[in-house]
């Protein structure tokens, strides 16, 4: 009778352990799904933000170019226009299909993705703001 009791208790322990392992696997898969959803949200916000920045910047560049394209430009204004065109190419190069974006971000945690996105923002927005400031300063000097 002791042997039957030991076998029954062992079976109960083994089945409880199997259930806990199964529950752990389910919770891990649920966490993976939640992480994927969070990554998609982060990417969506980033795309919308960059899209807005690109649209605004393109409109500004077109207005700036239309005002100064047909007039005489100084060497400094020519350099500013070349830099603006280079920045526009950089902004266009950030457009990736979603699959490539998922491949790049797979394996990163959310903090690493946010840091990478912030670095890209700083790399692009810093020179853009400087060039726009210089261009506006030059226009104000000419007007004033």
Swiss-Prot record:
Propeptide residue span(s): 19-43, 74-123
- UniProt keyword annotation of Signal present: yes
Where is this protein primarily located?
secreted
Residues with Tyrosine amide modification: 70
Pfam family name, one: Bombinin
Q: What is this protein called?
A: Maximins 9/H3
The entry's note on the tissues where this protein occurs is:
Expressed by the skin glands.
Q: Which GO terms describe its biological process?
A: defense response to bacterium; defense response to fungus; killing of cells of another organism
UniProt function note:
Maximin-9 shows antimicrobial activity against bacteria and against the fungus C.albicans. It has little hemolytic activity.
One GO CC term of this entry? Answer: extracellular region
- List the keywords (alphabetical): Amidation, Amphibian defense peptide, Antibiotic, Antimicrobial, Cleavage on pair of basic residues, Cytolysis, Fungicide, Hemolysis, Secreted, Signal
Q: Does the keyword Signal apply?
A: yes
Query: Which subcellular locations apply to this protein?
Result: Secreted
């Amino acid at each position: 009778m002791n042997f039957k009791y030991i076998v029954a208790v062992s079976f109960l322990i083994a089945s409880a352990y199997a259930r806990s392992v199964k529950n752990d696997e389910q919770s891990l898969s649920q966490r993976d799904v939640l992480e994927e959803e969070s990554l998609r949200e982060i990417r969506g916000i980033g795309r919308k933000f960059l899209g807005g920045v690109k649209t605004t910047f393109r409109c500004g560049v077109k207005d700036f170019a239309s005002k100064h394209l047909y007039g005489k430009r100084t060497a400094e204004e020519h350099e500013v226009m070349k830099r603006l065109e280079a920045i526009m190419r950089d902004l266009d190069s950030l457009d990736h299909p979603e699959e490539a974006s998922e491949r790049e971000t797979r394996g990163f945690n959310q903090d690493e993705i946010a840091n990478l996105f912030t670095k890209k923002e700083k790399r692009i927005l810093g020179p853009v703001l400087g060039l726009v400031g210089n261009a506006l300063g030059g226009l104000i000097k000419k007007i004033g």
